Structure formats: C-alpha cells, structure tokens
Curated annotation (Swiss-Prot):
Keywords: Amino-acid biosynthesis, Cytoplasm, Histidine biosynthesis, Lyase. This is Imidazoleglycerol-phosphate dehydratase. It comes from the Bacteria. It is an enzyme of class 4 (lyase). The keyword Oxidoreductase does not apply. GO terms for cellular component: cytoplasm. It catalyses: D-erythro-1-(imidazol-4-yl)glycerol 3-phosphate = 3-(imidazol-4-yl)-2-oxopropyl phosphate + H2O. Its EC number is 4.2.1.19.
Length: 195
C-alpha cells in the first residue's frame, strides 16, 4: 500500500497523520473540530483512502492554526506517499451536487502548487469551523503536496452543503489523480520525465 506518516509539533499544534492512498475509505481520529472531522470522513470515503489523525491545537484562540497546520501535514503526507509519482494518472476532476449546491474540483499533481478558489460561503461558520478556513486548508495542502488545485462553486446557498460538496469533490478528484494508470506503469506522466 502506498502510504506515509507525518508529524508536526509547534507551539500552536501537535499533529500526526497516517495516510494510505489505496485504502478502504476510513477516517479515524479527531481534530477537536467536529465539523472538520465530518469533512475528513467524507474525504476519506470519497477518496477511498485511509486517514488517521491525532491533533491537539490551540482552539481556545480559534481554528486557524489547527486547520492550516492540518493542511500542511496532509499535503506533506500526500507528497511522501506519492514519491516519484511514477505510474499515477496525475490529473483528476469531479463535479458534486448536493441539493441546491454544485461544486467542481480539478487538480493536477504536477509538483507546481497553485490554488484557485472561487467559492463564496454565505455564513461565517459551520459548527465550530470558520468558513474562511476552508480556503486556508486547501491552500496549505496544495502548497505542500505540490498540487495545482481549482475549486469552483457553480451553484449554492447553504454553507454546510457547499463545504461538504467541496470535500467530497476533492476526495473524488484525488482518487482519480493518484490511481495507477496501467498504460503508464513505471513512467511519469510528463514529457519532462519528472513531476
């Protein structure tokens, strides 16, 4: 199984992540932010990856340090799990509807980090999670994973539905991108020869 473990300890957070790309879609652990745990459950299920998180953060301040550092850690674990990226499909995309909401996520595991985030969430928080932290999570993740990531809200009105559709679509797009392409086995999908 392709996987990695990553640990990050700072004055603000203590985080450990175990990631297995060829998993059963299981999330285990707690971030201290209930809604974010729900999102990681969806990400794991739709990405068919196994994700275990241990996290202690300074949530008495707010969720910023915890959420951003989780993005950093997951991005680093993903980069480690992919290694030289030989044989992967590299690209992935998904549209996910949820009632009135429609989200599109497209990504490229190119080694060139860039985030395009075209999402307006009409509420300031869902549960304990400040909604502006969704963008910060994906920015940190894309930077550390070396991922070009586009997230677009095409239709939507309910904050919970929007964030849920984003995490589901990201999981499904990631599942496509990390899949092994039998026609490209042992090769990197780039004319440069590296990603």
């Amino acid at each position: 199984m392709r996987g990695a473990s990553y640990v990050r300890n700072t004055a603000e957070t203590r985080i450990s992540i175990d990631l297995f790309l060829d998993g059963k879609g299981v999330y285990d652990g707690t971030t201290g932010i209930g809604f974010l745990d729900h999102m990681f459950t969806l990400l794991a299920r739709h990405g068919q990856l196994d994700l275990t998180i241990g996290c202690q953060g300074d949530l008495e301040v707010d969720t910023h340090h915890t959420v951003e550092d989780l993005g950093i850690c997951l991005g680093n674990a993903l980069a480690q799990a992919l290694g030289d990226k030989k044989g992967i499909c590299r690209y992935g995309h998904a549209y996910v509807p949820m009632d009135e909401t429609l989200v599109r996520v497209c990504l490229d595991l190119s080694g060139r980090p860039f985030l395009v985030y075209k999402v307006k969430i009409p509420v300031e928080r869902v549960g304990q999670l400040e909604t502006e932290m969704v963008e910060e999570f994906f920015r940190a993740l894309s930077n550390r994973a070396g991922m070009n990531l586009h997230i677009h809200l095409l239709e939507g009105g309910n904050g919970h539905h929007i964030i849920e559709a984003i995490f589901k679509a990201f999981g499904r797009a990631l599942r496509q991108a990390v899949a092994i392409d039998p026609d490209n086995a042992g090769r990197v999908l780039s004319t440069k020869g590296v990603l």
